[in-house]
Amino acid sequence: MKPSIERLDHDDYIHRYVRIDGQRIHCVAAGCGQPVLLIPGWPQTWFAWRHVMRALAEKGFMPIAVDLPGTGHSDRPLDGYDTGAAAAKLHRAMAALGHEQYQVVGHDVGMWIAYALASDYPDAVLRLALTEAVIPGLARAPDIFAPPEQNIFLWHFMFNQLTDLPEALIAGREKAYLEFMFDRWSHRRDRVAVDVYIAAYAAPGGLRGGFAYYRAIPETIRQNRERAKRKLEMPVLAIGAEHATNDAPLATMRGNAVDLCGVVVPDCGHFIMEEAPEAFIAHLAPFLEGRV
């Protein structure tokens, strides 16, 4: 089925729905210039990129943030949540928007998908920035008996993969569950739009759509073991946060990218684009401009 586009303009952004195989993907753009695809993670939406979008638009880029399939204002398909399938949909969405080549920035689960996108479509992805995650199939599997300060960033990987039980326990209690995450994963929680994300994941199908990326981890690992046989050749920037993954994004990509650099943003938690937007952009913008 040929992709189609619905355009809805309001606020400072252009909101579009791109239909891929009959399913809508919500895309939000600002500015004009070289396109930069911004992929959020769990449990967030495109809104996590709002500060980055404004800054990149002012610097002459066209940032395009998405709601991943199954989340936010995008449709909620029954399957297709492994990173290869998600990357293919986003690549087709960018093509439908008129962009055959673009730069990519991914956070959290969005980092997993950004890596798959760069590996599967190397001629399309000019530069790749990855932040605040490790990638299943590239990183070593974490220890089950981890100390509490590590386990707080790990336990949900197993819980979210369970079939049906998370929804049964959390439905109607989304606020308590998600606030637990935001409280413990952030260092500057007051800067994070927690209520926006709670509303998004409390919407019908929101929980299942987010958990689906975790339930697809076995297939994503299988794919990534194949991807790891060839290193990325485009420039790659890995950004960590001092009070979250620290240098883990860089460590994950060592040996998997030819042209790799990394940085750790101090005094910051997991939600780096909201907690420390100025510092994040100070590293990201020169990289996208080709000055790093």
Predicted regions and their residues:
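Conserved residues at beta->alpha junctions
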Residues: 40-43, 201, 275
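Residue-level detector of alpha-helical segments with a strong bias toward transmembrane helices
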Residues: 32, 51, 77, 142, ...
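Flexible "cap/lid" subdomain of the alpha/beta-hydrolase fold that forms the substrate-access gate
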Residues: 2-27, 64, 71-105, 109-265, ...
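A generic "binding-loop/recognition-motif" signal
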Residues: 23, 33, 268
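Alpha-helical and His/Cys-centered functional microenvironments
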Residues: 44, 48, 111, 274
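Surface-exposed alpha-helical interface segments used for non-catalytic interactions
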Residues: 47-50, 54, 88, 115, ...
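Catalytic histidine-centered segment of alpha/beta-hydrolase-like enzymes
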Residues: 268-281
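Conserved HGGG/HGGXW glycine-rich cap/lid loop of the alpha/beta-hydrolase fold
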Residues: 28-73
